[in-house]
Curated annotation (Swiss-Prot):
One of its GO terms (cellular component) is extracellular region. The modification Lysine amide is found at K39. This is Mucroporin. Residues 45-74 form a propeptide. Keywords: Amidation, Antibiotic, Antimicrobial, Antiviral protein, Cleavage on pair of basic residues, Membrane, Secreted, Signal, Target cell membrane, Target membrane, Transmembrane. The keyword Membrane applies. Residues 1-22 form the signal peptide. It comes from Lychas mucronatus (Chinese swimming scorpion). Disulfide bonds: none annotated. Expressed by the venom gland. One of its GO terms (biological process) is defense response to bacterium. It comes from the Eukaryota. Belongs to the non-disulfide-bridged peptide (NDBP) superfamily. Short antimicrobial peptide (group 4) family. It is found in: Secreted; Target cell membrane.
Amino acid sequence: MKVKFLLAVFLIVLVVTDHCHALFGLIPSLIGGLVSAFKGRRKRQMEARFEPQNRNYRKRELDLEKLFANMPDY
């Protein structure tokens, strides 16, 4: 009777520790996911403030500089 009781307690402790280990392993990934979600939302909010035609202004400006640099002088 004692052996069955000890075996049952051991299995319960084993299952509980396994679940706790899984939970504590999950917490850092949840925190990382929340942080990246907030950063992504902040980025989307900043992009929404700019007009669509001005969003890629710097890229177009660099393309024009490259185009003018390659044009021959007349």
